[in-house]
């Protein structure tokens, strides 16, 4: 792949920052080189965005105009689904089938917000007094910042860019340093779809440089970030200092609960998918497993059988379940947590190491891992590992279970497996999590809001709520009678 250029104000140009590279996690080969954006590039992108969103042609555009662009974006994504899936796989190592699913979900996101902006647009009459007409309307914020992670680039980028554009904003997209390919290709797709110049700029670069400066810039009116909790906490402070909104989708240490009446096969398969798909590199991964003591032995036996049968390999190979981790540095971090778990008294039942297959030697692969023998207070149960590592724990008392499931600084997601729907709903109300799955896991609907409790984030993405998050509300009062205010008489 040729050297990449960054995208600013409708122009492709060489970044002014230091050289950076994109590597294929499956074998370490070079995907592309590019020069990162620098602060001058950032200034130009914000200036271009400010001009573009204030342009009356865009500011006064009817919702169907923005919807048409988003539908065209969806058409272009769908027409190139296989190509984009390969690019996504090269960007972060996801198996092709999984990458293609994310590509298609990105197209669906564009279509959803195309429809949503038409439903939401316009003045809404509100209850009023005699001789007074009151209206409420939603307006764009202006230039907004979207800072995205490396684990699901095209999906997470579209979940920010599509509603922001639908709402009428100009977006500065800062992709993760490790995965610039999809963000830059997304810019090309929006350009081909007819989005006016300046409404989307893409600035690859270091988060500590570009991300921080973007968040601090006085003309940036919202920060939306998906990534680590420490960075999210820093950005929340920056937003608070500026008194601007911040949407933060952060880490997780999600509990999965298996009650004594659960279907063993259904639960084992769902648990396996919930932790080991995406090689465990998902904020929602079900990494803490609580199994009722009466079901512990049979469920663990089936879960181990399924896990040992997972195919770990090159993401372009047929039938692969688990691809590589993003890079060797991250893999070492996962391995360090496994070693820590052993020191804390954990027993590794499967995995816990780098695969011995010489064909995988150049990639950042790690075997799916199941550990038992730890308590919920262990660091491996409290800290986000972000890899294919599951810790299993038996429980007997339901009240103690709820306390332990909620004993985490995180509150992103949870799963429940049971045949008793009423009991599951009762449990779901007691779990401190933004999303609770019952007899399924890691499935989504773009129409349903998503976000976390506690240190898993602030705000919501997806759904109408996810569109309103990119807008500000204005109230208008119009006197309809001829009455005169006599206060100053």
Would you name each region that the model predicts?
Residues 31-37, 54-58, 146, 256-259, ...:
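Short, well-ordered beta-strand elements within core beta-sheets of diverse protein domains
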Residues 31-120:
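Glycine-rich loop-to-alpha-helix module at the N-terminal edge of alpha/beta enzyme cores
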Residues 14-16, 20-21, 36-40, 262:
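A short acidic/small-residue loop/turn micro-motif
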Residues 28, 66, 88, 110, ...:
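Residue-level signal for inorganic ion chemistry
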Residues 1-27, 52, 353:
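Hydrophobic face of amphipathic alpha-helices that form TPR/SEL1-like repeat modules
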Residues 29-31, 220, 257, 311, ...:
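Conserved C-terminal structural/oligomerization subdomain of aldehyde/semialdehyde dehydrogenase
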Residues 230-375, 438, 485-489:
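ALDH superfamily catalytic-core signature
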Residues 122-266, 395:
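Rossmann-like NAD(P) dinucleotide-binding subdomain of oxidoreductase/dehydrogenase enzymes
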């Amino acid at each position: 792949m040729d050297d990449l250029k960054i995208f600013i104000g409708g122009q492709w140009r060489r970044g002014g920052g230091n050289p950076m590279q994109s590597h294929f996690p499956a074998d370490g080969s070079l995907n592309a080189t590019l020069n990162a954006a620098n602060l001058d590039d950032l200034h130009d992108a914000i200036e271009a965005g400010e001009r573009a969103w204030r342009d009356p042609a865009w500011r006064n555009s009817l919702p169907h105009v923005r919807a048409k662009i988003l539908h065209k974006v969806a058409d272009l994504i769908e027409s190139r689904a296989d190509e984009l899936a390969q690019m996504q796989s090269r960007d972060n190592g996801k198996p092709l089938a999984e990458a293609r699913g994310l590509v298609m979900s990105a197209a669906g996101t564009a279509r959803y917000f195309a429809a949503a902006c038409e439903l939401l647009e316009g003045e809404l009459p509100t209850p009023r007094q005699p001789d007074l007409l009151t209206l409420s309307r939603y307006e764009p914020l202006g230039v907004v910042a979207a800072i995205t992670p490396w684990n699901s680039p095209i999906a997470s980028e579209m979940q920010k860019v599509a509603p922001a554009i639908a709402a009428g904003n100009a977006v500065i997209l800062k992709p993760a340093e490790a995965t610039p390919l999809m963000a830059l290709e997304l810019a090309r797709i929006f350009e081909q779809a007819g989005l006016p110049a300046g409404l989307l700029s893409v600035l690859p670069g270091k988060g500590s440089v570009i991300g921080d400066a973007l968040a601090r810039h006085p003309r940036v009116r919202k920060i939306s970030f998906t990534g680590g909790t420490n960075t999210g906490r820093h950005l929340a402070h920056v937003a608070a200092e500026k008194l601007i909104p911040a949407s933060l989708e952060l880490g997780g240490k999600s509990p999965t609960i298996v009650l004594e009446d659960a279907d063993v096969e259904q639960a084992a398969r769902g648990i396996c998918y919930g932790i080991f798909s995406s090689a465990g590199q998902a904020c929602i991964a079900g990494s803490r497993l609580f199994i009722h003591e009466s079901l512990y032995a049979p469920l663990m036996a089936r879960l181990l059988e399924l896990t040992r049968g997972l195919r770990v390999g090159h993401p372009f190979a047929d039938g692969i379940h688990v691809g590589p981790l993003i890079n060797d540095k991250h893999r070492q971090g996962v391995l360090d947590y496994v070693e820590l778990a052993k020191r804390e008294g954990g027993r590794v039942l499967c995995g816990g190491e780098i695969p011995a297959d010489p064909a995988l030697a150049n990639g950042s692969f790690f075997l799916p891992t199941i550990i038992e023998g730890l308590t919920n207070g262990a660091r491996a149960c409290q800290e986000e590992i972000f890899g294919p590592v599951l810790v299993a724990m038996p429980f007997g008392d339901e009240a103690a279970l709820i306390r332990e499931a909620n004993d985490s600084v995180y509150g992103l997601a949870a799963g429940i497996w049971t045949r008793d729907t009423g009991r599951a709903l009762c449990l779901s109300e007691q779990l401190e999590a933004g999303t609770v799955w019952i007899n399924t896991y890691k499935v989504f609907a773009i129409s349903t809001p998503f976000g976390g409790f506690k240190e898993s984030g602030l705000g919501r993405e997806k759904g109408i709520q996810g569109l309103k998050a990119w807008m500000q509300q204005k109230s208008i009062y119009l006197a309809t009678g001829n009455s005169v205010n006599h206060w100053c008489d």
